C-alpha cells in the first residue's frame, strides 16, 4: 500500500493526511515520511469550514482521507483508494519549494479558529523517538493501544517509538470510557496506553 500510494505523489509536496486511528491513516503517514512527502496531520473530523479554509491557505497538492469523506471533495481528482482511505489530487497548480529537512507538520494543541502548524524535521523525529525509547526502555515485546489521535504530537510519538523498536500497535477509534476499548485491550493483550489529563 505504501509504495502504491506514494507512487502517485510527487516528492517534496504537501499532503493533508486526515487522520483516524485506522490502518489507512497510519500506512499513509509511514509512506509519506519514507517517500519524502510532507504530511500535514489533521483530524479527520475537523470542522468542514475550517478544513476548507486550511486547504485554501496551504494549498496542499493532495488530500489523503477516509474514503467515506471523499465525496465531500468532488472537485478534486480521485487518484488512489485502498484499505478505507482515498488519495485526492487537488487542483492547485502552484508548486512550493519545501525545506529538505521538513518531515511533517502538526497543529498546535488548543488551536481554535485557525490552527497553527509546527514543523518537525526528520532529525527532530529521530532524536525524539530515540530519546523516548531509551528513557522508557521500549522493546519489540510492547503492544501499545492508540488512545490518542495520531494527529497529536503525543499520539504520533507513541506510534514512532513503537515502530522504531519493532513493537506492535493496536489501532482503535474507541475511547477509554467505552467497553469495546477495554475488550480490545484484553483481546490484543495491550501492554500500555497513554493519556493526558482532562
Predicted regions span which residues?
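Hydrophobic alpha-helical segments in the ANL/AMP-binding
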Residues: 23-41, 52, 132-134, 153-165
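Conserved AMP-binding/adenylation subdomain of ANL enzymes
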Residues: 126-143, 153-194
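Proline-aspartate-enriched helix->loop->beta-strand connector
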Residues: 59-63, 190
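ATP-dependent adenylate-forming carboxylate-activation enzymes
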Residues: 1, 19, 40-55, 69, ...
Amino acid at each position: 500500500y505504501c509504495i502504491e500510494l506514494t507512487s502517485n505523489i510527487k516528492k517534496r509536496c504537501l499532503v493533508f493526511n486526515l487522520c483516524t486511528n485506522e490502518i489507512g491513516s497510519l500506512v499513509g503517514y509511514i509512506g509519506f515520511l519514507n517517500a519524502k512527502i510532507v504530511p500535514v496531520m489533521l483530524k479527520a473530523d475537523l470542522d468542514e469550514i475550517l478544513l476548507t479554509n486550511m486547504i485554501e491557505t496551504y494549498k496542499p497538492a493532495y488530500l489523503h482521507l477516509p474514503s467515506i469523506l471523499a465525496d465531500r471533495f468532488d472537485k478534486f481528482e480521485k487518484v488512489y483508494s485502498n484499505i478505507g482511505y482515498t488519495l485526492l489530487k487537488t487542483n492547485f497548480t502552484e508548486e512550493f519549494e519545501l525545506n529538505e529537512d521538513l518531515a511533517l507538520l502538526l497543529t498546535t494543541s488548543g488551536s481554535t479558529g485557525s490552527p497553527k502548524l509546527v514543523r518537525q524535521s526528520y532529525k527532530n523525529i529521530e532524536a525524539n523517538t530515540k530519546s523516548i525509547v531509551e528513557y522508557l526502555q521500549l522493546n519489540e515485546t510492547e503492544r501499545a493501544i492508540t488512545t490518542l489521535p495520531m494527529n497529536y504530537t503525543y499520539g504520533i510519538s507513541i506510534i514512532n517509538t513503537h515502530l522504531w523498536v519493532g513493537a506492535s500497535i493496536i489501532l482503535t477509534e474507541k475511547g477509554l470510557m467505552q467497553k469495546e476499548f477495554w475488550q480490545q485491550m484484553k483481546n490484543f493483550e495491550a501492554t500500555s496506553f497513554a493519556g493526558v489529563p482532562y
